Amino acid sequence: MTTGPFVPNPTIDPKSLGKVGVLMGGRSAEREISLMSGNGVLAALRARGVDAHAFDPGLQAVADLAKQGFDRVVISLHGRFGEDGTIQGLLEQFGIPYTGSGVLASALAMDKEATKRQWQTHGLPTPDFVMLHAGADWQAVADRLGLPLIVKPAREGSSIGLTKVTSVAELPAAYEKAARLDRDVMAEQFIEGDELTCPIIGEGESATALPLIRIVAPQANYDYQNKYFTDDTRYECPAPIPADVAARVQALVVQAYRGLGCRGWGRADIMLRKSDNAPFLLEMNTSPGMTGHSLVPMGARAAGISYEDFVLQLAASASLELHASTDWKPE
């Protein structure tokens, strides 16, 4: 596994990428952020001379990508219908290369329960959790996980629907809030310590962890508002932690990325326990944000990679997982 410096390919000819679609918007609760990410990516590609065009699958049929002659797409969609394997499956059907993880890895990473169970199978550390339902024994949940704990939808991103619960009495309302967004709701053990995130690029043995970022949010509340719409959240990159701890976290992140079968790029969220510097994996994002507040560009800059260089490299990495045979004939 690789945690060393990543050097972008300086020989990419923008014209060789053909007509590039930047998928943005979509139909998820993260539409607004997706539009911000997509417009940043679009501007970067055009600045490098790429024939790039915006495409909103929330307003246009994905089949139009093939009809309009797109050679590849950069996925700047976040959340459902863009980060969960659905759009990836359609692009495989139409034979249009795309950035990021394939169908299965995208679906796994979008589902927090599936992600955690996969990591547990690989022996990777992740906080204990319980799946909730309306008739749950709230006291039993608190007894198992301890307080405070986190309640969140199993298939949303950007901390949408997330609540930090400090008493048993708060659990029913936290569950209802999350259940309005997803039928599957998770209660997760709260790990006290530093909140870290780590961008990853590449695939398989070539997967590379970029510098870690420590997130210091107001009142330690890194919610949707503090992620995207405030300047009060502080980001420290590289994270000010001991070098040996940082290397251990980066190695763990690469294992987590590979364990889900991710490719192209991603970003792992981690808690570093205060008592002993033990890392715990929280989530894997397979289509991370690329806004002015986003963390992947920050990690890339710390590694000496400009926003435009990163986006150009990302567009060049577009590929298909499946290669349909043209020789098959029915018997």
Swiss-Prot record:
Coiled coil: none
Reaction(s) this enzyme catalyzes, per UniProt: 2 D-alanine + ATP = D-alanyl-D-alanine + ADP + phosphate + H(+)
UniProt keyword list: ATP-binding, Cell shape, Cell wall biogenesis/degradation, Cytoplasm, Ligase, Magnesium, Manganese, Metal-binding, Nucleotide-binding, Peptidoglycan synthesis
Binding residues for ATP: 142-197
Protein's GO biological process: cell wall organization; peptidoglycan biosynthetic process; regulation of cell shape
Cofactor binding description: Binds 2 magnesium or manganese ions per subunit.
Location within or outside the cell: Cytoplasm
Protein's pathway: Cell wall biogenesis; peptidoglycan biosynthesis
ATP-grasp domain location: 116-316
Designated name of the protein: D-alanine--D-alanine ligase
Native species: Ralstonia pickettii (strain 12J)
Gene: ddl
